[in-house]
Amino acid sequence: MLGDGKEGTSTIPGFNQIQFEGFYRFIDQGLIEELSKFPKIEDIDHEIEFQLFVETYQLVEPLIKERDAVYESLTYSSELYVSAGLIWKTSRNMEEQRIFIGNIPLMNSLGTSIVNGIYRIVINQILQSPGIYYQSELDHNGISVYTGTIISDWGGRLELEIDKKARIWARVSRKQKISILVLSSAMGLNLREILENVCYPEIFLSFLTDKEKKKIGSKENAILEFYQQFSCVGGDPIFSESLCKELQKKFFHQRCELGRIGRRNINSRLNLNIPQNNIFLLPRDILAAADHLIGMKFGMGTLDDMNHLKNKRIRSVADLLQDQLGLALARLENVVKGTISGAIRHKLIPTPQNLVTSTPLTTTYESFFGLHPLSQVLDRTNPLTQIVHGRKLSYLGPGGLTGRTANFRIRDIHPSHYGRICPIDTSEGINVGLIGSLSIHARIGDWGSLESPFYELFEKSKKARIRMLFLSPSQDEYYMIAAGNSLALNRGIQEEQAVPARYRQEFLTIAWEEVHLRSIFPFQYFSIGASLIPFIEHNDANRALMSSNMQRQAVPLSRSEKCIVGTGLERQVALDSGVPAIAEHEGKILYTDTEKIVFSSNGDTLSIPLIMYQRSNKNTCMHQKPQVRRGKCIKKGQILADGAATVGGELALGKNILVAYMPWEGYNFEDAVLISECLVYGDIYTSFHIRKYEIQTHVTTQGPERITKEIPHLEGRLLRNLDKNGIVMLGSWVETGDILVGKLTPQVAKESSYAPEDRLLRAILGIQVSTSKETCLKLPIGGRGRVIDVRWVQKKGGSSYNPEIIRVYISQKREIKVGDKVAGRHGNKGIISKILPRQDMPYLQDGRPVDMVFNPLGVPSRMNVGQIFECSLGLAGSLLDRHYRIAPFDERYEQEASRKLVFSELYEASKQTANPWVFEPEYPGKSRIFDGRTGDPFEQPVIIGKPYILKLIHQVDDKIHGRSSGHYALVTQQPLRGRSKQGGQRVGEMEVWALEGFGVAHILQEMLTYKSDHIRARQEVLGTTIIGGTIPKPEDAPESFRLLVRELRSLALELNHFLVSEKNFQINRKEV
């Protein structure tokens, strides 16, 4: 909440609202809009007419529940029914039926869709808004060339440009351009109409040559000239109806369809009053655009800023789903046409039911959710990740930019982003600046623009209510907007005279009386990720960016803990993520256990199932723990059960632990982190991870594959965990190499491998003897753990195309270990370098050993000083048993407000606990601490405190890898690369130089031959290792050298080479 009751209030909107509003707009408007475009379909003889009656459409409630859809790998969707009629024109009879058109995937309470059992989310795209944009570029002579670009609704472009002789050209492609007179004539105007409708007719007349007059003498001539230039055809084309249709389809429909947004933009830019339903480009638009272009040439008018948000539009979930529905209905139209003509050809009587199939709609949506770049698998690492994913804005995707072609200006922060797109939160790497995040209060308007709320200020009495306005980027340019650092909501109570404000893309300092609007909230400019960083105003923006990305990578811990120092947004994030179970009605708890909570409400008994050990797609563990007791009365909205990484309905991603900023024997050099063994034995940073292993059974040409426990040639210990069906038992502890599912695949053996009696049977009776090969599901390296769930999914119609799938879920308990990555909330990340015994860790004056030692050199150069404030305030909070929620930019209250708050709390903590070392006036915030090994105090006082530290998903167990044996690439005969393929480490050019520098010739030779691509030497090494003996030295060239020779031969170059004998130094020439 913001403000008090008298002045008017503002609440933070729901974080999933963007997705919900988009889907609602699709169901409410887009669905009817697309269905109403479905044309009436007639047969060739015009005897039968098929049409849809849109008004009667119906979406049926899904037959299955969300949870079952995930469990059985199905799509959570609704069936769409529409009334259709078949009219026989000869007898004027009409047959009407309610037909099933297809399934439309629904959105659940998380703002996501479930497709084939997988949570998927559609992210919003930022595109150039359709309309006209004026720009200028310098040509090779340094003269400004003015252009006007008309962008259509489909992204097609038509450029108008004016040359130094003031002639205007329309550029239809990169190479071809035609006169604007020809284009206007081809669109149906004659010369008199053109000259009557422009402001500068004399300029149009000035470049009208005899040749031009001939071209625009008639509409047919103009169309032929235009077609010749547009299609780049040689010779003299002849005017025909088909040529007109082709031009209409290829040019006017694709490049000139503006849509309602484009029509609105062109009307406002060119001061036209053409009706909104006229969504195509008209000759009047072209002439008005040309007039504007001439004005630009003579210094009138302003150029457009292409990166301003008023020139962008948001393509939301609604638009993407509507486009797909249009595509599906176009496919359905073709199917209906084909079926009608087929029925007439075979003299069958069609009905609406058998004309329509549900395949086009269902497959279109399944392929959209599965393949479209803007439809992504929901990242469910922790509750914050789930929410942030749906609020992303992407410049990438169909019709947008690519990571390689986007320039720096597009990626940069623009003043119009203020309060709409977060200036901090973006991805790192090639997509930096192209994938952004919505600010907390931003919303998508009706015209696809991003809107931000502001308070309107009044001159009147203090009793007047404050009014809140949502402004689009084009509207807020005309207002003086104060930057939200003033406390008062009304002008009358303002103390400061001059305030920083924003006006027309500039940041100014103006008198308070001149302000029109003010920001409503300190968080207004930031995304959710950046808003969770306390003291963000004391951090460098690059580090804040890293922090907002790293909080999304935090692993939910087995015992979560609230942060002592937060920003106040933690509760809202947890509630909107849908992770905790929340009471929808008030009532009384009747029964609770780990699986469900039962309570009575208004005489009804309701049961709420809890999530138990569910796997997220990042292998983290989703689990709900009940927080209410039997017999307790609950209110609506109360927390019934906490989910992963939430405590008491608040986000809890990490732990508050005791940290010292000091160097320790070089073990925290370059961002390494030293930790105490208490964090391991106390299960402070222990997390559970659930991995999924699956196997499919197919029907092969030799017969079906079998799931069985009877697997020949395998040791009994590998099969010890299987039940009688050949599937691993629940609760088993499994190690690397154990069989999880026993499976045999039938195969026909070769003649030579038959036993004599089999050969006899085959010769006498012709019986085909088949053998089986084991294709069991084995537990890979690093997968050891406890089996917590086994699912046998059998799809309907068990054909070979729908194989049975067996999924085994294994839970791992992972303590923190050397190589794991930890991070604070200020971009201060590091890798665990050593785990020290608790007695060796530095300890405080009250005898407590610290839990973690960070390098103090990580603070000054990186300018993320917020961590020092958080660290000291966390210590005070832990001693006073207080939690702090601090909004950013608290310096607006007074100078040095953050420092004063921290010092006052430390002083109070030292007084209440009677520990003077907590706040020592000579070096406030620091304390003298002792070396655990010697008991001596360190030379200098050290900053100690309790910051909130997260354990990230980048864990050493997922990354560490070694190759003993594995596959080789077919062409180069070198080991494959990557952990997943059991690959090797590449010894590159620089590594070879390093080994040469050390003079380790034998090791280098091994790396370049035996261990890499010397085929014969590899086999000899295997032999000598088995029988014992000295390993022979390779004498000829390795395979990569032979490959080089072959590639040179393919270029007709022969490379001669010689082998020098090591014994007698004789040159021996060999053919490769």
Curated annotation (Swiss-Prot):
What Pfam families would the database entry show? RNA_pol_Rpb2_2, RNA_pol_Rpb2_3, RNA_pol_Rpb2_6, RNA_pol_Rpb2_7
Give the reactions, separated by semicolons, that this protein catalyses.
RNA(n) + a ribonucleoside 5'-triphosphate = RNA(n+1) + diphosphate
Q: What is its main location?
A: plastid
Instruction: Name the Gene Ontology molecular function terms of this record.
Output: DNA binding; DNA-directed RNA polymerase activity; ribonucleoside binding
Instruction: Write down the SUPFAM superfamilies for this protein, in alphabetical order.
Output: beta and beta-prime subunits of DNA dependent RNA-polymerase
Q: List its EC numbers.
A: 2.7.7.6
InterPro entries per the UniProt record, alphabetical: DNA-dir_RNA_pol_bsu_ext_1_sf, DNA-dir_RNA_pol_su2, DNA-dir_RNAP_su2_dom, DNA-dir_RNAP_su2_hyb_sf, RNA_pol_bsu_bac, RNA_pol_bsu_CS, RNA_pol_Rpb2_2, RNA_pol_Rpb2_2_sf
Per its UniProt record, what PROSITE patterns does this chain match?
RNA_POL_BETA
GO CC entries: chloroplast; DNA-directed RNA polymerase complex; mitochondrion
Q: What class of enzyme is it?
A: transferase
Q: Describe its assembly.
A: In plastids the minimal PEP RNA polymerase catalytic core is composed of four subunits: alpha, beta, beta', and beta''. When a (nuclear-encoded) sigma factor is associated with the core the holoenzyme is formed, which can initiate transcription.
What function does this protein fulfil? DNA-dependent RNA polymerase catalyzes the transcription of DNA into RNA using the four ribonucleoside triphosphates as substrates.
Concerning its family, UniProt says: Belongs to the RNA polymerase beta chain family.
Cross-referenced HAMAP family, in alphabetical order?
RNApol_bact_RpoB
Name this polypeptide is given: DNA-directed RNA polymerase subunit beta
Q: Which organism is it from?
A: Crucihimalaya wallichii (Rock-cress)
